[in-house]
Amino acid sequence: MVSEIKTLVTFFGGTGDLAKRKLYPSVFNLYKKGYLQKHFAIVGTARQALNDDEFKQLVRDSIKDFTDDQAQAEAFIEHFSYRAHDVTDAASYAVLKEAIEEAADKFDIDGNRIFYMSVAPRFFGTIAKYLKSEGLLADTGYNRLMIEKPFGTSYDTAAELQNDLENAFDDNQLFRIDHYLGKEMVQNIAALRFGNPIFDAAWNKDYIKNVQVTLSEVLGVEERAGYYDTAGALLDMIQNHTMQIVGWLAMEKPESFTDKDIRAAKNAAFNALKIYDEAEVNKYFVRAQYGAGDSADFKPYLEELDVPADSKNNTFIAGELQFDLPRWEGVPFYVRSGKRLAAKQTRVDIVFKAGTFNFGSEQEAQEAVLSIIIDPKGAIELKLNAKSVEDAFNTRTIDLGWTVSDEDKKNTPEPYERMIHDTMNGDGSNFADWNGVSIAWKFVDAISAVYTADKAPLETYKSGSMGPEASDKLLAANGDAWVFKG
C-alpha cells in the first residue's frame, strides 16, 4: 500500500537542463506510482522570465516521453508554478515566498518543504542564508535542502560551505546528492554482503586479497574543458563517487539499516582511511593524461578544445587506499577512473585469496572473484574454481552470473527519482554526510597538493586503452592485477 507524501519542493535552477532531463521526469514517476497525489506542489525558480503557462509547457515537454495518458500528465502539471528570481537579491525572496505560500494553501500542504539547489555551487550558501533570513522555511513539518555536487573544491572550501549552510540548516537537514549512491547496483552491495552469510563471513582480510573499484569512460573531455581542466579525474570522480562506493565496501555491519547507523558505520571506515604524505602519494597513486589513439577522432587531451597547451591535468587516476582497521589489515583497495578508456564500465571486483589445498596436480587453484557491475548493465558475476574435464584432478575457473532483467530495469527507479523520494521520507542513508565528505576531501587534498606542485610523474596513455602501464605496475608491486581489462 503506497502512502501519500505531502510535500512542497522548490527547484532552484528550475529551467535548467538537469531539471528538464532528470528532475521533473523523476517527480512525475513518483506521481504515477501514487507517492504524490493531491497534496504536493512544485515551485520552479530561475532568472529566466517565464509565466506559469510557459513554465508548465516546459514541464509538459520534459515528461512527454514518459506517458501516453495526457489527462494524467495535465493533472500532474497543475501542481507546478513558477517565479523568476535572483538568488543574490534578498528582496526578490519575498516574491518566491509568496509563490510558495500560495502553492501550500492551494494544495493544503502544512510545512514539509524541500529546496533543491540545481545551481552553480557559489550560490549554495547565499540561497541557504536567504531562505532562513527572509522567512521561507516552514514553521511546521520539515525543511530539507538538496545539494548537487560539487560540495566544495577542497576541504577548506567545503568546510566554509558547510558552515554557511549550518547557519540555516542542521546537518541532518542537508541531503548532499551523489547520484551514484542512487544506482540500484550500488545499493545491492549491502544486500549482497549482509544478506548472504557466505559473503558476510568472508568479507575480511582472512579471505579477501584485494578490492577493486573501476569507473571508466570512453568519452574524452568533450565540451567540458573549462570545468574539467580544474578538476580532473581526481576531483570529478574519485573524491565523490568512488569514495562513496568504497564506503559501502569497507564499512562494518551497521547496528541497524537506518540512515543513522549506516552513516555511523561508513564514518568509522572513513575515519580509518590513511592520509598519504608526498612520498606515499608517489608510491600509491598514478596520474595520467590521454594521448592519441588509433582513430583520427581520438585527439590527445592537450589538443582538445579549450584545453591549455601546457595543462598538467589528470584525465586518469589509479591508486591504492589503505584502512587502519583489523578487518582490512594488509588488504589494498584499488581505485581507478579515467576518460577515453577502452570501455564504459562502473564495477566492483572483490578478489579472494587463492585456495591452498594441494590437489596433487600441476594446476593451482585460481583466485575467486566476485564482481558487481553497476554500469552500463546491472550484473553480478562470480568466478570460482571447479574440476576440469580432464582425467587428472586439475582445476579450472567457471563463471556464474546474473544480469538485471528487462522487467527489473523497467521497474527500477532512476537514481534521481530514488533520491528525491528518499529526501521526502527523510532517509539520508544514500546521501553523504559531512564527516564522509570532509574525510574524502582531506584524503584527496593530500594528493592534489603533490600534483599542483608538480611533484609526481604525469604519465600518458593511449586513447582506447585501459590507462598507463604504471597503473598495472601499481598492482603488480603487490602481486595483483586489474580484473577488468576493458
From Swiss-Prot:
Record's protein name: Glucose-6-phosphate 1-dehydrogenase
UniProt effect for mutating residue 183 to Q/R: Strongly decreases catalytic efficiency toward glucose 6-phosphate
Effect of residue 47 to A: Decreases catalytic efficiency toward glucose 6-phosphate
Binding site for NADP(+): 13-20, 47, 86-87, 149
Pathway assignment: Carbohydrate degradation; pentose phosphate pathway; D-ribulose 5-phosphate from D-glucose 6-phosphate (oxidative stage): step 1/3
Annotated function: Catalyzes the oxidation of glucose 6-phosphate to 6-phosphogluconolactone. Can utilize either NADP(+) or NAD(+).
GO molecular function: glucose-6-phosphate dehydrogenase activity; NADP binding
UniProt cross-references to InterPro entries, sorted A to Z: G6P_DH, G6P_DH_AS, G6P_DH_C, G6P_DH_NAD-bd, NAD(P)-bd_dom_sf
Catalytic activity: D-glucose 6-phosphate + NAD(+) = 6-phospho-D-glucono-1,5-lactone + NADH + H(+); D-glucose 6-phosphate + NADP(+) = 6-phospho-D-glucono-1,5-lactone + NADPH + H(+)
EC number: 1.1.1.363
